[in-house]
């Protein structure tokens, strides 16, 4: 008589493995779009925060120049797209009032913030004189990078 082999019940059957993988695939399939939209939203929020950092920094510069009697924002970039590129960021803002002060030197890390793709923002400044004789100073910041989640979002601020 042959000895009976005992069956071991440790491990998974093929059916249990297939069902587990199907459940895992379903969970991953539903989580990926949620994760993607969260990532995109986070990048858009970061871009808005960077534009606000630029605005605040330029307003601080404006206040300093106002106290010195010559209120102004850093000049508009003279490149075709008015982008705050490295050439503009390294150019002296006002050689008479503050020699050696460049847009990038206004920031603690020595760099003008960029969008989440590493591309510069659009920047423009202008002033307008009201009928009362009051001069209003404006800055416009805009994300012109078509690949950015905050594409075409802009902020106009005045003082």
Q: Where are the regions that the model predicts?
A:
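N-terminal secretory signal peptides that target proteins for export/translocation
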Residues: 1-6
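Short, glycine/small-hydrophobic-rich surface segments
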Residues: 58-106
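N-terminal single-pass transmembrane signal-anchor helix
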Residues: 7-35
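Aliphatic-rich helix starts adjacent to a transmembrane/signal segment
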Residues: 21-25, 34-53
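Extended alpha-helical scaffolding regions
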Residues: 96, 105-112, 121, 133-135
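Conserved alpha-helical elements of the SDR catalytic core
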Residues: 31, 38, 58
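Short, surface-exposed interaction loops/tails
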Residues: 117-159
């Amino acid at each position: 008589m042959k000895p009976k082999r005992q069956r071991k019940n440790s491990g998974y059957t093929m059916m249990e493995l297939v069902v587990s993988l199907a459940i895992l695939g379903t969970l991953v399939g539903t989580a990926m779009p949620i994760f993607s939209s969260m990532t995109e939203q986070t990048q858009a929020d970061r871009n808005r925060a960077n534009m606000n950092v630029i605005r605040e920094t330029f307003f601080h510069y404006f206040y300093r120049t106002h106290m010195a009697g010559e209120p102004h924002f850093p000049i508009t970039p003279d490149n075709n797209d008015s982008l705050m590129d490295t050439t503009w960021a390294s150019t002296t803002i006002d050689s008479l009032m503050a020699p050696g002060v460049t847009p990038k030197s206004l920031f603690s890390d020595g760099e003008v913030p960029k969008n989440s793709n590493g591309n510069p923002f659009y920047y423009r400044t202008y002033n307008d004189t009201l009928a009362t004789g009051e001069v209003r100073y404006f800055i416009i910041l805009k994300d012109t990078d078509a690949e950015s989640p905050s594409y075409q979002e802009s902020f106009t601020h005045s003082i």
